[in-house]
Amino acid sequence: MFKRTIPLFAAFTLAISPSIFPNYAHAQEDKPKTNQYWWPKMLDLSPLRQPNATSNPMGEKFNYAEEFNSLDLNAVIEDLKKLMTTSQDWWPADYGNYGPLFIRMSWHAAGTYRIYDGRGGANGGFQRFAPQNSWPDNANLDKARRLLWPIKQKYGRKISWADLLVLAGNVAMESMGFKTIGFAGGREDAWEAININWGPEGKWLESKRQDKDGKLEKPLAATVMGLIYVNPEGPNGVPDPLAAAEKIRETFGRMAMNDEETVALIAGGHAFGKTHGAASGKYLGPAPEAAGIEEQGFGWKNSYGSGKGKDTITSGLEGAWTVTPTHWSHNYLQNLFNFNWVKTKSPGGAIQWVPENSNASSMVPDAFDPSKRHAPVMLTTDLALKFDPVYSKIAKRFLDNPKEFDDAFARAWFKLIHRDMGPRSRYLGSLVPKEAMIWQDPVPPVDYKLVDANDIANLKGKILNSGLTTSELVKTAWASASTFRGTDMRGGANGARIRLAPQKDWPANDPQELAKVLKTLESIQNNFNNAQADGKKISLADLIVLGGNAAIEQAAKQAGYDIIVPFTPGRTDATQGMTDVKSFEVLEPKADGFRNYFDKSNNMSPPEMLVEKASLLKLSVPEMTVLVGGMRVLNANTGQNQYGVFTDKPGTLNNDFFINLLSMSTEWKKSSETEGIYEGYERKTGKLKWKATSVDLIFGANSELRAVAEAYATDDAKEKFIQDFINAWVKVMTADRFDIKAANANINS
């Protein structure tokens, strides 16, 4: 959905500028400065502290899945349908139907998703909070959400804002004659804004996010600060359809859409509704977060005419694409190819396109006055579908095969609004389609009897007697499970995709060593499964995790502690056919501080990448700290490098890493031979004792991390260290087990 225009740049920038609020600007100057302000290079640990569970007014015991499953979803849908055509005086509906507005709202809630870090998307309902609620591209969506409030108020905790924002758009399409393929609930609400890197710019609608080759910096997906996708007038406001196609392909690709899905979404989405640019953006007031308190969360107050209805200003663009703005049709593609398009300007001053044929000037009905008619419009980004050779071929095929287009749009729309939800096991409700789609990273169902406690004990014995080392078993289990991303719920140990392309060949996973470990574990798996007469099996996915657990139990025993690492079977093994290789490539770790692995292509430092990895794993500061300390003494670094292995007993689970890191008997210096490496010398003898990376030393250098490291380095912390390491380990191993809750370790010392 392309709803933004360059002529409004100045207006939107002015709208949020403190200069128009003198007292506010003065208050900003007097604000206390943060530590990050004084020491901008200090490691930012805030990603590991958000969101705060105490912010949730529903309480820790609230179970949204139970509430949603008790919801009368059909009743909600009927209420939404009624709302669509019940126009309100305070914000009149175009053509008497709010459907197109709700589609835009849903699209912009979900369309922030990006593949490189899994952030964005509809989960959490973040469109309610800053900055999304005040992005220029989300102008007037505050009205759409306010229209939904009576329905949210009626059904309360049984449906989240996050689900309602998406459901409304889905119902809108159905009510206007388009057949979707379904809807899944399960998006829980966030209760506070979170800090996400949306780009480096300091002003709205700027674009300073390209590398030297003109490509977007990772992990960003949108091309402009404050837009969902691209500038609809063309790159930097230049009306060049082919240049626009390049930007569309890049940004939609980074939002998990291929060329066919991109064409389907644009052509399908623009079958509905219109753009709004009755006048210049100078008439618009501040966005919601900068508006006066009396506006009660509304923004973009419009002083032009009535400020609503026919006088609405949103993007600065003006007009509808089709002759049926509130009914599903294929008229968008028909108009796109049947007319020659000439450049013009909207009343708001935005560049757009109209048919060269003057006979088309009365094709489109007016949104409010039945006596008026208009020409259809296209945006520069629409014409990209006509002139880009790849897009054009797809669009013409859709034009000639309407049923194929309908199916493609239905599937692309479903993907758009569900892409950030993770596997189908998280889907709720009666409208979930039965088909498993490859972008959902499917895994087979458990159609066999699971192993019991005796089997687990026997299997652990076989693993430990197989010749595999503690290091190899721990590294393999970690490599399998730590692909999980709590942002879009992708990755994790379930599926055992570590044995498949592309994961089996990732440098971070030590491919040759990994192949050896997997071969041994597969032999144990086959021998066990073939020996069972009652249909009992163990998956390789389970066996990989069990191997890591067994190795940790053995390592703890060497430290004097008998432990049982909690293990719950139930993972299954995906096939290569269930795995979209390209889709999984974005999960490859370019840095993993837990394994002391770092690819120099990163644009962040190793400690920053460690925090990023821990954040994706949903770890806290103590969990990140204890895991690094444990992984080091277990000798679990990639490539068997010895950086940070501060122990003379590698393979024994103890707190040596912290004890030796904090010891004043060591003096640290930068290596003169290897960039990024530090050398620890004995102060008394000058003898080289340790080597480390910045990831290792940050736990002694950063004051907050040092405080946690000290907690694990005390004489009475040995058992606590092991307990906490096991609990954090199990959290990672079970991160993708949405069917269970992680259990805590039980130590018998």
Curated annotation (Swiss-Prot):
The keyword Oxidoreductase applies. The active site is at H108 (proton acceptor). The keyword Signal applies. Its main location: periplasm. There is a cross-link at Y229-M255 (Tryptophyl-tyrosyl-methioninium (Tyr-Met) (with W-107)). One of its GO terms (biological process) is hydrogen peroxide catabolic process. Its cofactor is heme b. It is found in: Periplasm. Formation of the three residue Trp-Tyr-Met cross-link is important for the catalase, but not the peroxidase activity of the enzyme. Heme b binds at H270. Induction: Induced during exponential growth and is the predominant peroxidase in stationary phase. Binds 1 heme b (iron(II)-protoporphyrin IX) group per dimer. Keywords: Heme, Hydrogen peroxide, Iron, Metal-binding, Oxidoreductase, Periplasm, Peroxidase, Signal. Its EC number is 1.11.1.21. Residues 1-27 form the signal peptide. PANTHER family: CATALASE-PEROXIDASE, HYDROPEROXIDASE I, BIFUNCTIONAL CATALASE-PEROXIDASE. Bifunctional enzyme with both catalase and broad-spectrum peroxidase activity. Important for stationary phase survival. This is Catalase-peroxidase 2. The lineage of its organism: Bacteria, Pseudomonadati, Pseudomonadota, Gammaproteobacteria, Legionellales.
